[in-house]
UniProtKB/Swiss-Prot annotation:
UniProt KW Signal keyword: yes
Gene Ontology BP annotations: peptide transport
Disulphide bridges: none
Protein name listed in UniProt: Probable ABC transporter periplasmic-binding protein SapA
Family (UniProt): Belongs to the bacterial solute-binding protein 5 family.
Superkingdom of origin: Bacteria
């Protein structure tokens, strides 16, 4: 426990202050002439997405700083080439060979000047750091790689090796049909091995996760904690020069403050507006609104390691008390679907017969009484910031608190702030946790294993602390086949186990929302996370009629 907490605090401390030396400058100075302002709620604990479980680096920044071997088409949900031009699946899914794109330059920054283009050394370095526990880089800034740890990545990847300068091969201990999809997530962003070697010589390895260097369309120019992040155009970006010279990511306001900035023009783009703000956004002719299905789920996690919540009957009784339809109306305002599974309805493995629970407070009260739990008090831990899957976590908690009171259960709401949330959850004092998950993968495994596998307890993404060897076995069966029908059958079984055991109660799968000023063009809103800003531009005033 001490080691886990220490690792979390080390990572949190990486960017707690100013990330790079920069002169004091107003974040929005002359931005309309050379870029745009992207307003978002969040904070930065690391600039390396593989070291994060979620947050701003994964949702927004990774697509600007870095590239991955593969991408996911935001419209067809198919895998696409990115740094890998092509790939081969060998040995029934136990070997994956990637043929890399040539002439992909890394960013030239104030802290690093590359002397070569991206090659196989960079891919090997990136993934050896993650899976090889003996690699000298594995423990830099803590040994945790939350997403990959939850997948037991280090246990299944036997090797990643360079076949030549532009060919890389991964060998797995067991076939894994989801492997390509995990490499298409932002957690699998490719780092510069040359930059890492430079930092090694200077004995400054920790800077790799603090001062990023990637191949993406924008690079870090300035960072002021809790205020803003300034991104500068990567002029040599391999897809072509991004259209905007700079982007300011504004971190300085909460929900209503960000809306005010959008209305006054201080913000050009508002990420994840609250559903309650939709009528304002729709009625203002100066604004545009984009809605897309989201690969996400909001859920209530029961701490199954703590009595009486270790009893599935208790979890089912409590679930009956929650009025999910009221959550849809009061929190999401029609921008979400009631979740009947951990998987969103857009997933190819979603079970159309799935039904986890119902709203029946009388039955809940009766079952709790029969279990001898008539005066139960529970602590509900809640993040304070809006999330992609839940625009108003605290209000959601208050509604759940009121529902529980109707069946005689007292719920004490404990707001949990920012970077210490995971560390505090590991001390096991909570009973319930309001959380969620969003993925940039269309593979069901990106929901099941990170949230509910036994390994995910140690990676701090399994907030229910639930471990079922039978469930893990079903997930392994799903990964062992390249046949879609066999995988769907296994995931149906997994969803059936979850409906019986109920370690978490899925609440909603929400739409992804984005509001922006009328003159901003080229934004792409993906179901899987934020897309690159490379194609964003501001239409000139003489070319657009102002509303």
């Amino acid at each position: 426990m001490r080691q886990v907490l220490s690792s979390l605090l080390v990572i949190a401390g990486l960017v707690s202050g100013q990330a790079i030396a920069a002169p004091e400058s107003p974040p929005h100075a002359d931005i309309r002439d050379s870029g745009f302002v992207y307003c978002v709620s969040g904070q930065v604990n690391t600039f390396n997405p593989s070291k994060a479980s979620s947050g701003l680096i994964v949702d927004t920044l990774a697509a600007q700083f870095y590239d991955r071997l593969l991408d996911v088409d935001p419209y067809t949900y198919r895998l696409m080439p990115e740094l890998a031009e092509s790939w081969e699946v060998l040995d029934n899914g136990a070997t994956y060979r990637f043929h890399l794109r040539r002439d992909v330059p890394f960013q030239k920054t104030d802290w690093f000047t590359p002397t070569r283009k991206m090659n196989a050394d960079d891919v090997v370095f990136t993934f050896q750091r993650i899976f090889d526990r003996n690699n000298p880089w594995h423990n830099v800034n803590g040994s945790n790689f939350p997403y990959f740890d939850s997948l037991q990545f280090a246990d299944n990847v036997k090797s990643v090796r360079k076949l030549d300068n532009h060919t890389v091969e991964f060998r797995l201990a067991q076939p894994d049909a989801s492997f390509l999809w995990h490499l298409a997530t932002h957690y699998a962003s490719v780092m510069s091995a040359e930059y890492a070697r430079k930092l090694e010589k200077e004995d400054r390895q920790e800077q790799l996760d603090r001062q990023p260097v990637g191949t993406g369309p924008y690079q870090l120019s300035e960072y002021r904690a809790g205020q803003f992040i300034r991104l500068q155009r990567h002029d040599d970006f391999w897809r072509g020069k991004p259209l905007m010279p700079q982007v300011v990511v504004d971190l300085g306001s909460g929900g209503t403050g960000r809306l005010s900035k959008l209305l006054t023009g201080e913000c050009d783009v508002l990420a994840w507006p609250a559903a309650s703000q939709l009528s304002i956004l729709r009625d203002d002719p100066r604004l545009r609104l984009t809605l897309r299905p989201g690969m996400n789920v909001a859920y209530l996690a029961f701490n199954t390691a703590k009595p009486p919540l270790n009893n599935p009957a208790v979890r089912h009784a409590l679930a009956l008390a929650i009025n999910n339809q009221r959550l849809m109306q009061s929190i999401y305002y029609g921008t979400a679907e009631t979740a009947a599974s951990i998987l969103p309805r857009a997933s190819w493995a979603y079970d159309n017969e799935a039904k986890i629970t119902e709203y029946n407070p009388a039955k809940s009260r009766e079952q709790l009484k029969s279990l001898g739990l008539e005066n139960l008090t529970l602590k509900l831990w809640v993040p304070t910031r809006s999330q992609a899957w839940n625009p108003s976590p605290l209000k959601t908690a208050e509604l759940i608190q009121a529902d529980m009171a109707q069946v005689g259960v007292k719920v004490v709401i404990v707001p949990v702030e920012g970077r210490f949330q995971e560390a505090r959850l590991m001390d096991m004092s909570h009973d319930l946790t309001l959380s969620g998950w969003a993925t940039d993968s269309n593979d069901p495994d990106s929901f099941f294993r990170p949230l509910l596998s036994c390994a995910a307890i140690h990676s701090q993404t399994n907030l229910a602390h639930w471990c079922d060897p039978k469930f893990d076995s079903v997930l392994r069966k799903a990964l062992s086949s390249q046949q879609l029908a066999a995988r769907i059958e296994a995931y149906d079984e997994a969803q059936s186990i979850l409906a019986q055991e109920l370690p978490i109660l899925p609440l909603a799968s929400s739409l992804r929302l984005q509001a922006y000023r009328y003159d901003i063009k080229g934004l792409v809103l993906s179901p899987f996370g934020n897309a690159s800003f490379a194609g964003v531009y501001r239409e000139k005033q003489d070319e657009v009629k102002k509303p």
